[in-house]
From Swiss-Prot:
It comes from Bacillus phage SPP1 (Bacteriophage SPP1). Its main location: virion. It is found in: Virion. One of its GO terms (cellular component) is virus tail. GO terms for biological process: virus tail fiber assembly. Keywords: Viral release from host cell, Viral tail assembly, Viral tail protein, Virion. Gene3D superfamilies: 3.30.2000.30. Homohexamer. Interacts with gp16 connector protein. Tail completion protein that caps the tail and interacts with the connector gp16, thereby attaching the tail to the capsid. Transmembrane segments: none annotated. This is Tail completion protein gp17.
Amino acid sequence: MTWKLASRALQKATVENLESYQPLMEMVNQVTESPGKDDPYPYVVIGDQSSTPFETKSSFGENITMDFHVWGGTTRAEAQDISSRVLEALTYKPLMFEGFTFVAKKLVLAQVITDTDGVTKHGIIKVRFTINNN
């Protein structure tokens, strides 16, 4: 069996779900991997990923934890509402990608903090996806 990493395919599928979910896109200016210094709030950033093996006797897969960062304005409610829309976007339709089989997803963390500037609200979401190689 050939092993391959699912992280890039998973990231592409999650971005497609986020960008196609109208209730989210009505609330944010963009979904991006690397926002510009002067990009206006609010927006969603696809953050770090980590992967650990998920193996059985007959298959190889991964548990991939992905971070999603919500950069809101000055209210906690806005960051919470956008964070909720991110979770809705990840679950409103199946994640579609070739070469892998989606097994499960689990919310690991959802929190809103005040950024180091003392004003901006920052939502942090961690979701664990279990993916098998085909």
